[in-house]
Each structure stands twice: as C-alpha cells, then as structure tokens.
Regions:
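A gly/ser-rich beta-alpha-beta helix-loop segment of oxidoreductase catalytic cores
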Residues: 109, 562-568, 572-603, 609
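Anion-binding (especially nucleotide phosphate/pyrophosphate-binding) glycine-rich loop
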Residues: 452-583
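Glycine-rich beta-strand-to-loop/alpha-helix junction loops that act as flexible
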Residues: 69-71, 214, 425-430, 514-518, ...
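Residue-level signal for inorganic ion chemistry
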Residues: 23, 66, 108, 132, ...
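Short beta-strand "acidic-cap" motif of Rossmann-like dinucleotide-binding folds
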Residues: 29-34, 133-134, 232, 513, ...
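Structural signature of FAD isoalloxazine-binding scaffolds in flavoprotein oxidoreductases
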Residues: 489-494, 521-539, 588-618
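ATP-dependent carboxylate-amine ligase
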Residues: 1-52, 62-66, 74, 84-87, ...
C-alpha cells in the first residue's frame, strides 16, 4: 500500500496518535479526529502538522483509508461518515501490521511493561547509532523524543503490538520480544487458553528469533518446538544479565553469554525495571550485534510510568499506569525497594469486566501498601456489570472507597500528616488529573506564603503589560453587565502571554480571553480567574502583503478590517460589515453573514497554544 490520505480516529490516544505520526513520516497526508481533546498527544500531533478534522472531506481532503482505535465502536458518527464515503476502515493494529509487513519488524508484546521495554529498545538503538523507525504506545518523558518516527533508509521498525483486541494476529515479526504473559482481557478472550493460543501463533509466525525472560514457565511452554531460536534473558539465560550494584535511581548490570562480556550502568532501579532494561539490551543486540558503552544514555522514562510529579523531603507524589494486579504488585515492590517511609496508593480500576475478574487479586496486591484508597471504576466506555464496581475491590479489607474524587485531597492529607510517605496514583484511566491536582496542591502548601499571580510573574512581564486586580468587566462588554475579574491583564508581547498562562497552570487558575466583549454575559459575581484582553492597539495590526493578501493580528476589529480591505480594493470581505468583534473571536466560531464565512478568506492561521507554543496551519487544517 503506497502513501495516500488517511484519517485517524482516536488520534489523541496513545495507540493511534503515534501511528498517525509514523504515517506522516512515511509521506501520508494525515488528519485525525478524537471525541476527547486536551491529551498531551495533541501537542505531538500539532508538531507533526496533523490537523484534527471532524470531516476531512469537507476540508478538501479525500482519505481513502481510515484507521481507528478499537475504542471507536461501530455506529460511531465518524465511522458512519467514513463508510458513506467508501473509505477502507482498519483498526490500529491492522493498519500498523500492513505498514510493517514488508519491513524487518521487532514486535514487543506481553501483558506488562510493553511500552517501557519498547521505549528502552528505541533508546538503546538510538545510543548505538542505528537507523530505524519506531511506534511507541505512549509518550517519552524526554520532549526531544517523539512517540514515533519513520525511516526511509532502514528496513527496521520497532513497535509494541496489542493483544487486547485480537489485532496481534495480523503481525508476522522478524523478532518478537515477549516481556511476560498473564491472563487478562476477559472482555475479549473466553479464557486463558484462547489468549495463550494467540501468542503461540505469533511466535510461530516470527521469522528470526523470539526473546523471552529466562525462567518464565508460561512463555517457555508457549515457545517450545519453534523453528526459530528462542533467546532467554536473565541471570541464567542465553543473554546473561546480573545486577551487581546500584542505588535508588541507577543499576550496574554485568553482561555475559551472547552479550559481549562487560558491565553497563543503566538509569533504572528495581527488579521489574532492570528486567525490562535487560530485554531491551538483548533486542538491540539482535538488531545491531553490539552493545553501546552507555546503552540507555538517552533514557528518561515514559510518561505515566513511575512518573514523579512532586518531591520534597518526606513526601513524593507519583503517577503510574499500572492497571493489572501483577503490575500493581511490581510497582509496590519497586516502591519498597527504592523509597523509605509509608506507601499510600490511590487506585482507579480500569474497565468493569477487568475489575470483576480480578477484584480479589487487586485487593491482595493493594495490601502491600500501608494505605489504599480506591476510586470509582474508569469504564473506558464499558457498561457496568454486576460485581464490576470498586466496592468489590475493597470488600472485606481495610482499603477505603473514595466515591467522590473531591474528597480525595483531604483524605490524603490526613494520611500523610507530616510523616515520611510516598503517594502513588495508579491506573490507566483519568486518574492522572487527580495526581496532577494533588501535586499542585502540595506545591502551594509547601510554599512559605501561598503565592498568587503577581508573585509568579514578578519581573517577568514587559513594562507595557498591564496587570490589575479586581477589574470591573461590565465596561469591557457591549452589554455593560457583570461583576469583576479577580485578575485582568493586557499583555503586550507573546512572551507576556506565555508567562501569564504558565503561571495560571502553576496556580491552577482559570483564564479567559475577551476581545471586544460583544454580546458577552458576565455573572454578577464576576470571574474568579485571569481575564486576558488583546488590545487592538498592540494586537490588531494589519499589514498588506500584496497580491490581494493581508497579515492581520487577532485583535483587529472586523469593521476596521472590512474598511481597510475596501481601501485596498480587495473583494470578498463585504460580509464582515456589521459583524461585531475581533478577528480572533471570529476565527474561533467561524463567524459569517450574508452567505460569507471568515474561513472563506483565510489562507493560514498562526496562534499560541495554551502550553505557550506558537503554532501555524493552513486553512484546510481547520474543521470549518
């Protein structure tokens, strides 16, 4: 299949997003869509110039192929649209399998640690100077490492393959790296035998080698009698690895057997992390035939994998993706190995079917913590099932059910109570937002004086930037109604805007942009946050570029833009006459009148993201 136009559904997720970026690197015209936005993956898509379009055909694109997350179910409006256009629809795994079918493919599979091990293989190959492509199932902590990359000059591609939806059956790898295997996904597989059969068939389709951890009885049984070599990794494996030293953040590994005899230092600690690193080094050696002196020198970890969000003497707050009893048990062992003090876990079960299947195992795994708080189940679109609620996890134990997440911060504060502790937020749902909120809370509590906006921006704003407290908003609207803004700013430069938005993020402070305030209703009790106003004198400049083109600032008033266009002899702007407001606001809502729309006259847009990055895209990248 040659490169063409593709529409990726569920593009802000950790499975589809990286694949979209990989396809873009291969030369495809890629657009995406997701019902849920705000994911960190959205920034990666923007960096790769992949627009989110509700209807790519309406934007002038003609995707003949649609890739979808398995979470996008039949009957979804986007799928119905794709089918009505005659597009071919593939699940994420099926599409990835087609793209790597003619490549030398390294498949990373297993129940736990796929993303971490895959990321470590990428880091090890990068450290060895290898040329290759990859597709991760998450985000690197290192912002310089994108979640996917295509290589036009190398046949090698590394990616994790997902067993949860059966698409693992579409792959025929050169090298298969099986990190482990436990019973999981009872919503898809009838029993363990079904799951094992899928992995056995994958091993049988593998063309060069299968890599497994030494001593794993289940994987030994499933790889018995294969026609390709089975390479074992561990203290007694073909690739011998033995930890000989280390601390809470690093490990010294002694390598031997199929490895060159040497010692290497890797930036990981704990039994599970060392095992993942060993598997990654073995896979990199199979591909390159060598081991770099600093094999994981680029390794900074994976987001939501033992991700430390806050730390001060006596308290550490972290988030982890663990959502299976084995993963939780491994995480808690790592916490005991690398942290002193009490271990407090906040667990959000993922999917009702998994919760029902493993309620007792979750209860047992959580018992390794000093305290366990259990949140309501994150359904991931599943309907509730009997016995699939969080109540089944806490039943008959000392674990505490937190039914209202608003009560969580006070519950944690009472448990921490000035004693040395680590607080781990655990789960594959949206518990990360609770973790980030609690980390922000601790940063505020830890300050000698609770800071407010002026404290964080002092000395960092331009002299021309206005920042005022308790600003009346009634005079900022055409209706002349409403209360005051807690903070009001008129930034003079892009740097001013970035500084203000980052301070709001640190303070967990809401913000809102007001233009002319046309038909804007402000509550009588005002706005408890920051109101930003882009004054037209600084942000409304209009520059003629010739050939019927204008460069216009977002603060320009539409009436003035229409008048200037008339003076320049430019047609097509007449519909703007009589529309109140500024250009920025009109772009936000695709303002129009008399059969004309603002995007009819737009060539491209440059804007600032909430994270402070300057973005630019052409008209067909917008869902307008």
């Amino acid at each position: 299949m040659s490169a063409g136009s593709v529409w990726m559904l569920g593009a802000c997720g950790m499975g589809v997003g990286p694949l979209a970026i990989f396809l873009r690197g291969e030369g495809w015209e890629v657009s995406g869509w997701d019902d849920s936005t705000g994911s960190p993956m959205e920034l990666q898509l923007a960096d790769a110039e992949i627009p989110l379009l509700r209807d790519p055909w309406a934007a002038g694109r003609s995707p003949g192929l649609v890739g979808r997350s398995s979470a996008v179910k039949p009957g979804h409006p986007a799928l119905a649209l794709a089918e009505s256009r005659g597009a071919r629809v593939l699940r994420r795994g099926e599409l990835l399998a087609e793209r790597v079918a003619a490549r030398r493919f390294v498949a990373v599979c297993g129940s736990h640690g796929k993303t971490t091990t895959c990321g470590m293989i990428v880091a090890a190959l990068t450290g060895a100077g290898a040329d290759f492509g990859y597709v991760l199932g998450g985000l690197f902590r290192d912002p310089a490492m994108p979640p996917a990359r295509a290589s036009a000059s190398s046949p090698w591609v590394v990616a994790e393959v997902d067993e949860s939806d059966g698409t693992i059956g579409a792959f025929s790898p050169d090298v298969t790296v099986a990190v482990n295997l436990d019973w999981d996904h009872p919503d898809y597989y009838r029993d363990e035998a079904d799951l094992e059969a899928v992995f056995r068939r994958l091993f049988e389709r593998t063309r060069t080698a299968v890599i497994i951890p030494a001593g794993n009885a289940r994987l030994e049984r499933l790889t018995a009698g294969l026609r390709v070599p089975v390479l074992r990794v561990g203290a007694e494996g073909d690739y011998r690895v033995r930890p000989v030293a280390g601390d809470h953040a690093t490990s010294v590994l002694e390598l031997g057997g199929a490895f060159p005899a040497t010692q290497v230092t890797v930036p990981v600690a704990g039994t599970f992390n060392r095992a993942n690193a060993a598997m990654a080094l073995a896979a990199a050696h199979v591909v390159t035939g060598s081991v770099a002196a600093d094999p994981l020198g680029r390794w900074r970890g994976i987001r939501r994998r033992q991700d430390v969000l806050f730390e001060r003497p006596g308290l550490r707050v972290l988030a982890d993706y663990a959502h299976h009893p084995t993963e939780i048990a491994a995480l808690l062992r790592w916490l005991r190995e690398t942290h002193s003090g009490r271990v407090i876990v906040v667990f959000q079960p993922h999917r009702h079917t998994r919760t029902r299947q493993y309620a007792a195992e979750f209860r047992q795994a959580l018992s390794a913590a000093d305290h366990a708080l259990v949140m309501p189940v994150y359904s991931a679109g599943e309907a509730a099932v009997e016995g699939g609620g969080s109540e089944s996890v806490v039943a008959g134990s000392a674990h505490r059910l937190i039914e209202d997440r608003r009560a969580l911060p006070e519950a944690l504060d009472a448990l921490v109570a000035g004693q040395e502790a680590v607080v781990a937020f655990v789960g594959a749902g949206d518990i990360e937002r609770d973790a980030e909120a609690y980390a922000k809370r601790q940063r505020r509590v830890g300050a000698a004086v609770t800071p407010d906006l002026p404290d964080l921006v002092a000395g960092r704003l331009s002299p021309e930037c206005a920042l005022r407290a308790n600003e009346p908003l009634a005079r900022r609207t055409t209706l002349g109604l409403g209360g005051n803004a807690r903070w009001y700013a008129e930034p003079a430069t892009v740097d001013d805007v970035v500084t203000l938005l980052r301070a709001c993020a640190e303070l967990d402070l809401r913000w809102f942009v007001v233009g002319r305030g046309s038909n804007l209703l402000v509550p009588d009790d005002g706005y408890d946050g920051l109101v930003l106003h882009l004054d037209s004198s600084r942000w409304g400049e209009v520059t003629p570029l010739g050939e019927g083109r204008l460069r216009v600032g977002g603060g320009a008033r539409l009436k003035e833009l229409c008048g200037l266009a008339a003076r320049e002899g430019l047609a097509g702007f007449e519909f703007l006459e009589g529309i109140p407001g500024t250009l920025g606001g009109s772009l936000r809502m695709n303002a129009g009148a008399m059969g004309g729309w603002i995007f009819d006259v737009v060539e491209s847009v440059e804007w600032l993201s909430p994270q402070g990055r300057v973005r630019a895209a052409r008209r067909d990248s917008f869902d307008a």
